[in-house]
């Protein structure tokens, strides 16, 4: 019998089934213990986070006044750590060849309906030009697991190609990587290639369910997959991103496992997850979400986002175009700090949108708006769309980023950097309507920069971006 130990490097000890079940039992027994709930909320107000057991109690609590408090606290913590900034990114799919048998993913090896594709380096270049012409500066690259079609050398070549493209004023300044669990040696290669965050979704933390959902292929190995972030950090990658696919297993189990993973990374490596993603299972070729019994409604989803935000206040939280405009609006205020815009989930979908017959997408997109529309929508809601990648390029990663974030000092860099990168977007890519909204917003936000010297420099840089065609300023 494995014992719970967040300092262990063994998956079944730092994500311990017995500890999760005990935590859920404790939460059930105490969900109406309002004195305890209030103590947990008060602890969360310190903005140092709460543990998986405490978060489980809040998730189980159904008292309307307490839930309202949780939401208000999540809003405040989001504001304190991330201000009104929302980081923009887009996914880029290289290949949907895959040897795994994941039953919830249309890339699974037995799916004969889907059109298999793999981009050449010339096609990668065309995709990047299309993404740069939209205005994107940050990508999350994706590929199925296939050692023949998608070896690490192919991924590295694609990353090199992405960074080499500078079309007009365009540049991809940060490439985050979402590929299958791999070796320390391969993580070292990714680090040397200059990646930003290494992202790997756990899918589910329940080992029994995990093995049933991944019946064949290398991904079947629960321990190897779950221990991937430790290998990534051993390989020198500073920033890692975790997440589960909500709907595969009971959401209360998943939240506890997710937070235990964050606690483990913090305990062992001194740095918790740079990002946490919260995807929900969605329709796709050969995949019907109704086949899975653990789907969650929008209100439960919002509560999960709020609790993750107060449990792990420093982490970036990501939501994709899997979610509708209305859902994205609701969870933005509760904790989300990064969203995608103008996304294509097919292989090669940016340069030439594919026909229905080609059908290479990983999931159906719920928010089909263009990046320009999403940017304008965010600004009209009072947010600052940010295309900033300065921390990564200034070496503010890993524990250096976390210390700045936890102290609140990151705002002194991020606010002006967000405004400068937004100005770049407005000048180079935005529609007239979006540009008008954005430049008014920038003028208002510049006056909110508390440091007079920083404010003055930011104004000078924005003038140069707007009038002198200068780019890539950063604090």
Cite the ranges covered by each PLM segment.
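An N-cap/entry alpha-helix motif that binds or orients negatively charged groups
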Residues: 38, 42, 46-86
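Short glycine-enriched, charge-decorated loop/helix-capping segments at active-site entrances
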Residues: 213-219, 290-294, 360
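Canonical Radical SAM [4Fe-4S] cluster-binding loop centered on the CxxxCxxC motif
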Residues: 82-123
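Conserved C-terminal portion of the radical SAM core fold
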Residues: 143, 197, 223-287, 297-326, ...
């Amino acid at each position: 019998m494995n014992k719970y130990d967040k300092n262990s490097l063994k998956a079944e000890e730092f994500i311990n089934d017995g500890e999760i079940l005990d935590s859920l039992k404790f939460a059930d027994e105490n969900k109406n213990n309002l004195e305890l709930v209030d103590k947990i909320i008060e602890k969360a107000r310190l903005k140092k986070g709460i543990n998986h057991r405490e978060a489980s109690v809040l998730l189980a609590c159904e008292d309307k006044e307490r839930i309202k408090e949780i939401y208000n606290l999540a809003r405040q913590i989001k504001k304190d750590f991330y201000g009104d900034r929302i980081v923009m990114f887009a996914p880029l799919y290289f290949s949907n060849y895959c040897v795994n048998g994941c039953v919830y993913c249309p890339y699974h090896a037995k799916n004969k309906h889907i059109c298999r594709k793999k981009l050449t380096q010339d096609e990668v270049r065309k995709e990047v030009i299309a993404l740069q012409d939209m205005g994107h500066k940050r990508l999350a690259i994706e590929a199925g697991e296939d050692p023949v079609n998608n070896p690490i050398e192919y991924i590295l070549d694609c990353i090199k190609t992405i960074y080499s493209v500078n079309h007009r004023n365009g540049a991809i300044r940060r490439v985050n990587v979402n590929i299958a669990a791999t070796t320390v040696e391969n993580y070292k290669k990714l680090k040397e290639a200059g990646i930003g965050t290494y992202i790997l979704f756990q899918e589910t933390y329940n080992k029994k369910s995990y093995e049933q959902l991944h019946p064949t292929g290398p991904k079947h190995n629960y321990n190897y997959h779950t221990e991937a972030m430790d290998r990534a950090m051993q390989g020198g990658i500073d920033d890692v991103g975790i997440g589960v696919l909500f709907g595969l297993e009971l959401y209360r189990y998943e939240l506890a496992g997710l937070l235990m993973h964050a606690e483990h990374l913090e305990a062992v490596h001194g740095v918790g997850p740079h990002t946490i993603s919260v995807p929900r299972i969605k329709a796709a070729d050969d995949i019907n979400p109704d086949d899975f019994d653990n789907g969650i409604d929008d209100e439960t989803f919002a509560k999960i986002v709020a609790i993750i935000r107060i449990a792990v206040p420093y982490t970036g939280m990501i939501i994709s175009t899997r979610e509708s405009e209305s859902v994205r609006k609701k969870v933005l205020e509760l904790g989300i700090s990064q969203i995608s815009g103008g996304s294509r989930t097919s292989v090669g979908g940016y340069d030439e949108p594919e026909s229905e017959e080609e059908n290479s997408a990983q999931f159906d997109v719920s928010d089909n708006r263009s990046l320009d529309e999403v940017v304008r929508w965010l600004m009209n809601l009072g947010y600052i769309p940010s295309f900033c990648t300065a921390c990564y390029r200034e070496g503010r990663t890993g524990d250096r980023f976390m210390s700045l974030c936890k102290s609140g000092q990151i705002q002194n860099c991020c606010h002006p950097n967000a405004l400068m990168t937004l100005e770049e977007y407005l000048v180079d890519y935005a529609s007239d309507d979006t540009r008008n909204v954005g430049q008014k917003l920038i003028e208002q936000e510049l006056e909110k920069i508390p440091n007079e010297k920083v404010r003055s420099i930011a104004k000078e840089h924005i003038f140069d971006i707007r009038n002198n065609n200068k780019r890539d300023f950063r604090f």
